[in-house]
């Protein structure tokens, strides 16, 4: 089955204050891959984490991001490509003063279910819902159910 989407199309969710739009999901790709477009707010990004099942590929469409890969931090900007194999602790942060844009491919598919569970369907694509600190515990618990570990400092749990 082909997937044909125009700019802005796809299923969008607010995830920890950032906008994730799913372009291809496991249901559409027979479990092969998930593709999502992410708009990451200034200083936004996920907590450090490890995927035990999935590899991730990031293409920076716009912006500058600091990626922590294991113990190494590197800065990447528009046009950069980053492949992160499963088992690698990583995180990233938008270090610009404006939103940045990423195209992310995850293989195999399935991790979108985690994002659906921790996110909020995006009715308004410009204004995220207020941050609820209770989400942190939910993120840690649901990550375990999706073969991930999330490293949250104790003062934030």
Residue ranges: model-predicted function:
Residues 1-33, 125-157:
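A short, N-terminal "cap"/entry segment at the start of jelly-roll beta-barrel domains
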């Amino acid at each position: 089955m082909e997937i044909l989407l125009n700019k802005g199309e796809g299923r969008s969710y607010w995830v920890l204050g950032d906008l994730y739009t799913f372009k291809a999901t496991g249901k559409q790709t027979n479990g092969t891959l998930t593709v999502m477009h992410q708009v990451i707010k200034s200083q936004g990004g996920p907590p450090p984490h490890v995927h035990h099942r999935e590899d991730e590929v990031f293409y920076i469409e716009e912006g500058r991001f600091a990626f922590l890969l294991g113990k190494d931090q590197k800065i990447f900007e528009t046009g950069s490509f980053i492949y992160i194999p499963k088992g690698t602790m990583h995180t990233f942060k938008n270090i610009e003063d404006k939103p940045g844009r990423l195209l992310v491919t995850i293989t195999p598919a399935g991790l979108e279910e985690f994002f659906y569970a921790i996110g909020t369907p995006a009715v308004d694509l410009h204004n995220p819902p207020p941050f609820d600190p209770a989400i942190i515990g939910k993120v840690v618990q649901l990550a375990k159910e999706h073969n991930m570990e999330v490293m949250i400092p104790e003062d934030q749990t």
